[in-house]
Amino acid sequence: HTAGRYQAKRFRKAQCPIVERLTNSLMMHGRNNGKKLMAVRIVKHAMEIIHLLTDLNPIQVIVDAVINSGPREDATRIGSAGVVRRQAVDISPLRRVSQAIYLLTTGARESAFRNIKTIAECLADELINAAKGSSNSYAIKKKDEIERVAKANR
């Protein structure tokens, strides 16, 4: 990990390597805050598992998963004259990447909860399913749901 200050300026987090964004996103929920070495280890194990299961380059799998699970449009709340209605908006590329990484790590975290499988195995499964675009990935399901809501509010 680079220990870089990617939050200091507006678009600087776009320069952050995608694997590190994934690692940083894993450090969520109070008890895991700041435990970056733990997150690095999880990502490393997940990459090894991906390589064993698919024989593909794990970084390519991560990139495909992020591309497939980033929602293309979203519904935002627009309030005018006391009436709040949802309006469909396109999502900027940077937010697509951030949202995709968030959905992937959330899916891995939820599937690892109260489960024998380690979070590394769950993360590997989530990434492989999302890279394939299969609907038993949490991130793909959420993305479809977000886009369906946006389509209804066009």
From Swiss-Prot:
Keywords for the protein's UniProt record, in alphabetical order: Ribonucleoprotein, Ribosomal protein
GO terms of biological process kind: translation
CDD domains: uS7_Eukaryote
Domain of life the protein comes from: Eukaryota
Keyword Ribosomal protein: yes
Record GO cellular component, one term: small ribosomal subunit
Cited InterPro entries: Ribosomal_uS7, Ribosomal_uS7_CS, Ribosomal_uS7_dom, Ribosomal_uS7_dom_sf, Ribosomal_uS7_euk/arc
GO MF entries: RNA binding; structural constituent of ribosome
The keyword Ribosomal protein appears for this protein: yes
Entry-linked Pfam families: Ribosomal_S7 (PF00177)
PANTHER family: RIBOSOMAL PROTEIN S7
Family listed: Belongs to the universal ribosomal protein uS7 family.
Name of the molecule in the record: Small ribosomal subunit protein uS7
Taxonomic classification: Eukaryota, Viridiplantae, Streptophyta, Embryophyta, Tracheophyta
